[in-house]
Amino acid sequence: MRLLISGGGTGGHIYPALALIEAIKQKEPDSEILYVGTHKGLESRIVPSAGVPLKTIKIQGFKRSLSLENFKTVYLFLKSVHDCKKIIRDFKPDVVVGTGGYVCGAVVYAAARMKIPTFVHEQNSVAGVTNKFLSRFVDKVGICFEDARKDFPASKVVFTGNPRAQQVAGMKDTGRLEKEYKLRKDLPTVMIFGGSRGAEGINAAALKAIPQFAKKEYQVLFVTGKVHYDKIMAKDEAKNLPDNVRIEPYIADMPAILPEVASIVGRAGATSLAEITALGIPTILIPSPYVTNDHQTKNAMSLVNKDAALMIKEKDLTADILVKNVDKIMNDSDKRLQMGKNAKEAGIPDAANQVIKVLEDIMHK
């Protein structure tokens, strides 16, 4: 398979693309892959470090308010479509995939106009602007949440799940909690994590909760995010930590540690939920209030409604409420087991293979 793939801006668009690439390479080692992104986006660093060839185009997203910048955006879009057609002619892909972010708009649109099989993947419960626009031109649209179905032409929608799930589904306990973080193997661990950059609201509540956590029969691994770590460690609550609480700035290769944790407190981003459900981990979700269309709340509700997660709105989050919810899961092993089972049933552990099947179908239609 010759695959041209594009997605950028945030890790939520990039990591599913890389997971799909990995699955294709496992299935067809001779496959040729080309990733198209922007030189400013996260993809310019993440994609080459994953060993995937990258070409960049110049493009920018629309401003949501009326702005003269939008005229520049239209100009750059038209120019980048022209540039993408040249990239496509040179690479000669069998299929073109977009995983979201404005960069994939020009790439997938150009491919569709050139009559090349095209597919877009929507990770969230509320469709992004770019994927909504592209859905009129592509052959198929992959979704991860039933709520997203209504945003696309019904005949094009396929429920595939998130390829990232397949990447983590087979991961095993490697004892990192004990070896690297000096936590006990005989006590269950809850990980509190606000995303790669951390989250001030979650951090503030977790910090204030430390005196209560000190009295519990479970352990807490509190990951602050690098930018917040020094500030957190300067607080009184972070001094003389109890034996059952560890504070870390970040965790390298986070998914690899997930099989060792009994439960997670964190955001409700699409990639996180794909990983959590693939492994069947009960969670307390605190949706980010700063995302478009409040899509993280809708993501979270898909698991809350299946009794696979609890949810706290950030505006309601306090140390007491955090501890009360963590206790509900960590002090009740039967509940934890059932929530984990429900989470696993909500996941699609072979999501990358599901996407590959759709790609093969549209290539051979």
UniProtKB/Swiss-Prot annotation:
Keywords: Cell cycle, Cell division, Cell membrane, Cell shape, Cell wall biogenesis/degradation, Glycosyltransferase, Membrane, Peptidoglycan synthesis, Transferase. The keyword Cell wall biogenesis/degradation applies. Pathway: Cell wall biogenesis; peptidoglycan biosynthesis. It holds the Pfam family Glyco_tran_28_C. It comes from the Bacteria. GO terms for biological process: carbohydrate metabolic process; cell division; cell wall organization; lipid glycosylation; peptidoglycan biosynthetic process; regulation of cell shape. UDP-N-acetyl-alpha-D-glucosamine binds at residues 10-12, 124, 196, 251, 296. Gene3D superfamilies: Glycogen Phosphorylase B. Its EC number is 2.4.1.227. One of its GO terms (cellular component) is plasma membrane. It catalyses: Mur2Ac(oyl-L-Ala-gamma-D-Glu-L-Lys-D-Ala-D-Ala)-di-trans,octa-cis-undecaprenyl diphosphate + UDP-N-acetyl-alpha-D-glucosamine = beta-D-GlcNAc-(1->4)-Mur2Ac(oyl-L-Ala-gamma-D-Glu-L-Lys-D-Ala-D-Ala)-di-trans,octa-cis-undecaprenyl diphosphate + UDP + H(+). It is a peripheral membrane protein. One of its GO terms (molecular function) is undecaprenyldiphospho-muramoylpentapeptide beta-N-acetylglucosaminyltransferase activity. It is found in: Cell membrane. Cell wall formation. Catalyzes the transfer of a GlcNAc subunit on undecaprenyl-pyrophosphoryl-MurNAc-pentapeptide (lipid intermediate I) to form undecaprenyl-pyrophosphoryl-MurNAc-(pentapeptide)GlcNAc (lipid intermediate II). NCBIfam families: murG. This is UDP-N-acetylglucosamine--N-acetylmuramyl-(pentapeptide) pyrophosphoryl-undecaprenol N-acetylglucosamine transferase. It comes from Ligilactobacillus salivarius (strain UCC118).
